[in-house]
């Protein structure tokens, strides 16, 4: 049984009205009848251009937004059918790393509080135990305890993304959606973050849905690759096959348009 299974997933948004109350007819199918599976321990790379629906899929898989139709199963449980309490318990096992490492961190909070927030919510315990867990998490992402009393604006973009990764790891999740986690970083820093994610996967047995517009980034990290175009899944297969023998013309154009990534 796959860890994550998506069946016939669709997300439809109505077209908005203008200031005169006109328009609003029709709809946009951000995700259109998508089915895919993610096996435990693998990285499924979800790649496509801006507006392809890939980030919407990431949010649907975590049920951060509701689907228009279709199902999302995690360890055999249909998330769409779960009540708030059951879903809250499953949140421990499913986390997200956001694209913007600054916007995703509350600027009013110190690093210690940011990383500890999931522990406060899901694992009430002593402050001493939480602080030790936060130290452990920071070490895991290549930072030290000198970061604890500092605020997000005091760090570089790469360091902020490491803090976001530490927070995502706090509850020892099985599955992480990494939504364009290096697109806001320069190439060298982004490569360091990709290497960190690969290392954490090896050490912790994580499963990733890695979302990116960059085929070279996805090619480096992914076990399998799924290609999105205008809300539809146009090609899925092993990473080596997709990157060397693509069948779909859009996949071919993505490969031709992007340079190699040095990691």
Where are the predicted features?
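ABC ATPase NBD coupling module
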Residues: 20-25, 79-95, 113, 121, ...
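A short, proline-enriched helix->beta-strand linker immediately N-terminal to the Walker B motif
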Residues: 170-174
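Conserved ABC transporter NBD signature motif
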Residues: 70-78
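Conserved ABC ATPase signature
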Residues: 151-155, 159
């Amino acid at each position: 049984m796959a860890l994550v299974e998506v069946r016939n997933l669709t997300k439809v948004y109505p077209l908005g009205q203008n200031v005169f109350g006109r328009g609003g007819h029709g709809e946009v199918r951000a995700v259109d009848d998508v089915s895919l599976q993610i096996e435990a321990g693998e990285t499924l790379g979800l790649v496509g251009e801006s507006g392809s629906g890939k980030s919407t899929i990431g949010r649907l898989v975590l049920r951060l937004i509701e689907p228009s139709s279709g199902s999302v199963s995690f360890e055999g449980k249909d998330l769409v059918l779960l009540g708030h309490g059951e879903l809250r318990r499953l949140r421990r096992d499913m986390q997200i790393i956001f694209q913007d490492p600054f916007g995703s961190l509350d600027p009013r909070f110190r690093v210690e509080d940011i990383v500890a927030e999931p522990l406060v919510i899901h694992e009430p315990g002593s402050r001493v135990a939480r602080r030790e867990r936060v130290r452990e998490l920071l070490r895991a992402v290549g930072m030290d305890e000198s970061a604890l009393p500092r605020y997000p604006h005091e760090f570089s973009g790469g360091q902020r993304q490491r803090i976001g990764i530490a927070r995502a790891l706090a509850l020892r999740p099985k599955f992480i959606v990494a939504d364009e986690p290096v697109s806001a970083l320069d190439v060298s820093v982004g490569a360091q973050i990709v290497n960190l994610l690969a290392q954490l996967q090896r050490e912790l047995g994580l499963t990733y849905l890695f979302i990116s517009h960059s085929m070279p980034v996805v090619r480096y990290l992914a076990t399998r690759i799924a290609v999105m175009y205008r809300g539809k899944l146009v090609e899925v297969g092993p990473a080596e096959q997709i990157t060397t023998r693509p069948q779909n013309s859009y996949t071919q154009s993505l490969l031709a348009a992007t340079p190699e990534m040095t990691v």
